[in-house]
Amino acid sequence: MRNKKAPQTVSARHDAREHLSIEAYHKLNRASAVSRFVGGDLIHRELSGLHQLYIPHIFSYLNEDIDFVLNELKAKGLCRDFLAQQKDRGDRTHV
């Protein structure tokens, strides 16, 4: 007799592990989409004064979204092992 386990859907998964919030997930997706768009825009357009107006705002939005997700990951302890390794090495980069 085989021990078959039914595949779990996301809604059926209720375990003790910490998970990213839906807001953090959306912020990561938005940051990814915006950075992809800006990268493509900068490659295909001639630089003009308009870029100087909108690029600082875009990077500010990206920073806010990524900072939100990183702080959530740290608060949930999902970066605990990595941060401990950095602390042991004395590396303070990106903490």
UniProtKB/Swiss-Prot annotation:
Keywords: Early protein. It comes from the Viruses. Required for derepression (induction) of the P2 prophage helper by P4. This is Derepression protein. It comes from Enterobacteria phage P4 (Bacteriophage P4). The gene is Epsilon.
